[in-house]
C-alpha cells in the first residue's frame, strides 16, 4: 500500500495519541489536528482520510459535525467520533447502560469493507458512557453487542464509518486489521 496522509482529529480523548501511533506504525503519514481546525486548512493538507478520535463529551466536539457533512473524504469515527457522525446525520445518542471501559464481545452483522476479517465475533475495548441509540436514516448497521445495539455503522453512500470501540488499543482483538481496512478504503477512494 502506498503511503497515505491521515489526519487524526483530536476530540480530547485519552487514546488520541494511540490512534496517531497505530496509523504511523502502519507506515502512514499522520498528524493530530485540533477539532477546531477550519475545513479549508484540513483540505490544504490534502489528506487521504480523517479519523475522529474519542473524547469525554459532545460539547467539546468542535467542528466534527461540519467535517462529516462537508468534507468529501473517507472518515472513521471512533467512540465519540462515531456518535458525532450519528448526530450529524440525524441519529440519536443516549447514555449507555454500562459506563466506563470494558472488554466487549461484538457480533459483526455485516462484514462491510471496514469490518472485513473481523467477524463473526470480536473482542474489543469500549466505553459505553454514551452510545448511538438510533441510526441516522439510511445508515447501515454493521455490528452489535449485548451491551450496545449499535456498535458499528456506515453511511449508505459515502465512505463514512463509525465504531463505538477503540481499535487503537491493544485490548481490542483485530484492531490493527480494522485500521488497515480503513486505510485500504482511503487508498481506493
Curated annotation (Swiss-Prot):
CDD domains: GATase1_GMP_Synthase (cd01742). Gene3D superfamilies: 3.40.50.880. It comes from the Archaea. Its EC number is 6.3.5.2. Pathway: Purine metabolism; GMP biosynthesis; GMP from XMP (L-Gln route): step 1/1. The active site is at residues 79, 166, 168. Keywords: ATP-binding, Glutamine amidotransferase, GMP biosynthesis, Ligase, Nucleotide-binding, Purine biosynthesis. The keyword Nucleotide-binding applies. GO terms for molecular function: ATP binding; GMP synthase activity. GO terms for cellular component: cytosol. It catalyses: XMP + L-glutamine + ATP + H2O = GMP + L-glutamate + AMP + diphosphate + 2 H(+). Residues 5-189 form the Glutamine amidotransferase type-1 domain. The keyword Ribonucleoprotein does not apply. Signal peptide: none annotated. It is an enzyme of class 6 (ligase). Catalyzes the synthesis of GMP from XMP. Heterodimer composed of a glutamine amidotransferase subunit (A) and a GMP-binding subunit (B). PANTHER family: GMP SYNTHASE [GLUTAMINE-HYDROLYZING], GMP SYNTHASE-RELATED. This is GMP synthase [glutamine-hydrolyzing] subunit A. It comes from Methanosarcina barkeri (strain Fusaro / DSM 804). The lineage of its organism: Archaea, Methanobacteriati, Methanobacteriota, Stenosarchaea group, Methanomicrobia. The gene is guaAA.
Amino acid at each position: 500500500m502506498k503511503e497515505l496522509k491521515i489526519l487524526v482529529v483530536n476530540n480530547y480523548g485519552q487514546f488520541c495519541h494511540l490512534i496517531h501511533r497505530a496509523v504511523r506504525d502502519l507506515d502512514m503519514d499522520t498528524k493530530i489536528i485540533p477539532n477546531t481546525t477550519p475545513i479549508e486548512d484540513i483540505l490544504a493538507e490534502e489528506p487521504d482520510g480523517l479519523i475522529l478520535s474519542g473524547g469525554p463529551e459532545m460539547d467539546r466536539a468542535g467542528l466534527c459535525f461540519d467535517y462529516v457533512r462537508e468534507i468529501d473524504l473517507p472518515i472513521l469515527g471512533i467512540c465519540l467520533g462515531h456518535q458525532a457522525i450519528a448526530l450529524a446525520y440525524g441519529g440519536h445518542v443516549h447514555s449507555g447502560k454500562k459506563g466506563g471501559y470494558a472488554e466487549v464481545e461484538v457480533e459483526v452483522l455485516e462484514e462491510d469493507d471496514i469490518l472485513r476479517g473481523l467477524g463473526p465475533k470480536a473482542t474489543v475495548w469500549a466505553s459505553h458512557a454514551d452510545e448511538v441509540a438510533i441510526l441516522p436514516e439510511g445508515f447501515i448497521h454493521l455490528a452489535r453487542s449485548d451491551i450496545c445495539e449499535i456498535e458499528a455503522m456506515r453511511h449508505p453512500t459515502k465512505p463514512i464509518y463509525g465504531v463505538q470501540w477503540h481499535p487503537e488499543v491493544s485490548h481490542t482483538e483485530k484492531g490493527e486489521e480494522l485500521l488497515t481496512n480503513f486505510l485500504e478504503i482511503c487508498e481506493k477512494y
